[in-house]
């Protein structure tokens, strides 16, 4: 079992409350959304992996925001393409 001290992560983010929010968002990305960890997993849980990524400066609130904006843009582009394909199919009839 990995022992993680959060002091380095707190220092990277600024305060404990924001660190918790960032760690939770990143852990959710890893566990639920299937995002790849940026550090070795070492049989750790997603929350521990998220804290290690924060400690190393690999993850910040800004990087998570940018990643989410990119995901939204990709999803919207896919939806627009799907609607265009449907409309094109109707026009062909």
Curated annotation (Swiss-Prot):
GO terms for biological process: DNA-templated transcription. Keywords: DNA-directed RNA polymerase, Nucleotidyltransferase, Transcription, Transferase. The keyword Transferase applies. One of its GO terms (molecular function) is DNA-directed RNA polymerase activity. The keyword Transport does not apply. It catalyses: RNA(n) + a ribonucleoside 5'-triphosphate = RNA(n+1) + diphosphate. One of its GO terms (cellular component) is DNA-directed RNA polymerase complex. It comes from the Bacteria. Its EC number is 2.7.7.6. InterPro entries: DNA-dir_RNA_pol_omega, Pol_omega/Rpo6/RPB6, RPB6/omega-like_sf. It holds the Pfam family RNA_pol_Rpb6. Gene3D superfamilies: 3.90.940.10. Promotes RNA polymerase assembly. Latches the N- and C-terminal regions of the beta' subunit thereby facilitating its interaction with the beta and alpha subunits. The RNAP catalytic core consists of 2 alpha, 1 beta, 1 beta' and 1 omega subunit. When a sigma factor is associated with the core the holoenzyme is formed, which can initiate transcription. Belongs to the RNA polymerase subunit omega family. This is DNA-directed RNA polymerase subunit omega. The gene is rpoZ.
